[in-house]
Amino acid sequence: MNRLKKSHRQKSLFWRPIAPNPRWQKENPTAHGSTDTGGFGYNGGNEEVKTSSTMMNGIHALVNERQNEWLRGYEVDIKSRFDNIESVLKDILAQQSQLNFVSWANQQLFAKLGVSLTEQDWQSGVQLQSQKGFQFLYGKTLFAQFMRMSEDFFVNDPLSGQRKQEAERMFKEAGFHAVGIAPCADGRLAHILSYVLRLPYALARRKAHAGVMFDVSESVRNWVFIEHTRFRDGQPNLADEPTRYLKIAVYHFSKADPTHQGCAAHGSDDHKAAQAALQKLKDFKQAIENRFGCGSTVQTLLLGLNTDDDSMKVHIPNASGEVCLDRYVETEQLYQATMNLPDSEAKQALENAIVTCNQALGSTAPQPELVKLLSWLIGNNFSQIAYVNQYENGCYSDIGHAERFIGIGNGFEEVQLRNLSYYSFLDTVEEGVNDVDVGIKIFKGLNVKKGLPIPIIIRCDYDGRVPGSKDRAEAKALRIEKALHNRYQELSAPGLLQTLPTLRDFTSCKPAERLPGLADLSAKQRTA
């Protein structure tokens, strides 16, 4: 159990590169390629029908092994880029006697990490006191890796997250024209879409808050925008079609260490975390009905993620769409119960389990369309359960926090990996101060104790169609950066707070744009 309680970035014994598979390489040569994967992408991951011989080998009929292999390759590749920064930089800085050090250092950095820094960055880092210079260069290198990841993500679409047609069809058949998901800001939930639920990132609007304490008013404004787009443009469907908006909240818990590795925002109290998320869903639904009438009702869904193994509690709504904490199914139990069933029987068993869950507690069953959708999502989660079983021996070695950086602002679609980033949606530091404080507290344990800086990436999205939108987003990003350094001066002064302001046009698939920030201004002054 001591191994499970570790919260630093420790690689599992099963953390290894994927052995080349000729068949897989032919269809998807790299984790970042733009090769067409056909039915291999995010269509629920269950298109290939398993034979009886496959089931005899212990493979669940609803698990997509090829997709798991592909996702693992991406995860290992991206995380290694961030995890090796410290050791590579220390090796380089230990050899400052090299002739033409800056040029040599950049060559070494690119050869080992695939990124390079500007000559000004290297000169500034070398001029600073040893530890502060290392912290400066660490931040610059990590930010360069993020920009590289962002470009790869939006240009090459390595997770096929822009291919959302099949998933959209599933939700529309269930009566939903749009999906919003509100997970906790905890980095152990950052992969909720692409991995846990196996959904394309472009399908759902994701905005994370510590403890799932999302802003109800902001969520209502987004709902109004979606409904207006339906009315004016007929997108994603016509306003007179009988479909609704689906709002999903995701809290989290840990069965291995419930009193320490649960939700920090709720004191690792699982019931409080679930109750708070449910109350936010109720408030959101009530706000829309109060403002726009009962005919404008939305559907809500509550999920609980076990961050030890990525299995879930799926809280089953009744016939009226009401959610209750006591009505839920556990995907790990359903995974085991359906292990030896063929594809069609396993799917039917899931639908039966959803219906009987409510009946056992004297409640009504969900609408048939919702039963089918929930069954599909649970089946998707089976692939993630198998993923953790295969590559993490059934339980993550880093069951606690092990994030590499903090992301604040909006967007961050390119962050789709578990424990890569602590991400919190905010408009201003003042409004999101509680979320940011939680992130800073986490990184004091992860980084500061080891002499590493806390890297914070700021993202402000803009609408490229709107005149002045980019300028306003830039001013906002720089304002947030300044507010961070003012609030956390005890970290900023010794170089333990490194920040990168970025922008992105959310109307396109273009990557993040780097802005010159406070660190760049200071570096320019030092080298002038």
From Swiss-Prot:
Keyword flag Ion transport: no
Catalyzed reaction equations: hydrogencarbonate + H(+) = CO2 + H2O
Pfam family, one: CsoSCA_N
Positions of region (Disordered): 17-47
Regulation: Inhibited by ethoxyzolamide and dithiothreitol (in crude extracts upon expression in E.coli).
GO biological process, one term: carbon fixation
Superkingdom of this protein's organism: Bacteria
Induction record: Induced by growth in low levels of dissolved inorganic carbon (DIC) (at protein level).
Record bears the keyword Metal-binding: yes
Binding site for Zn(2+): C184, H252, C263
Disruption phenotype: Cells do not grow in low DIC levels. Cells lose carboxysomes when grown under low DIC conditions. Accumulates intracellular DIC normally, poor CO(2) fixation.
Co-factor requirement: Zn(2+)
Keywords: Bacterial microcompartment, Carbon dioxide fixation, Carboxysome, Lyase, Metal-binding, Zinc
Any single GO CC term annotated in Swiss-Prot or TrEMBL for this entry: carboxysome
Active site: D186
Cofactor note: Binds 1 Zn(2+) per monomer.
Chief localisation class: other
EC numbers on record: 4.2.1.1
GO molecular function: carbonate dehydratase activity; metal ion binding
Localisation per UniProt entry: Carboxysome
Family membership: Belongs to the beta-class carbonic anhydrase family. CsoSCA subfamily.
Assembly information from the UniProt record: Homodimer.
Record function comment: Reversible hydration of carbon dioxide. This bacteria encodes at least 3 CA enzymes. Essential for chemolithotrophic carbon dioxide fixation, supplies CO(2) to RuBisCO (ribulose bisphosphate carboxylase, cbbL-cbbS) in the carboxysome.
UniProt-recorded name of the protein: Carboxysome shell carbonic anhydrase
Protein species of origin: Hydrogenovibrio crunogenus (strain DSM 25203 / XCL-2) (Thiomicrospira crunogena)
Gene: csoS3
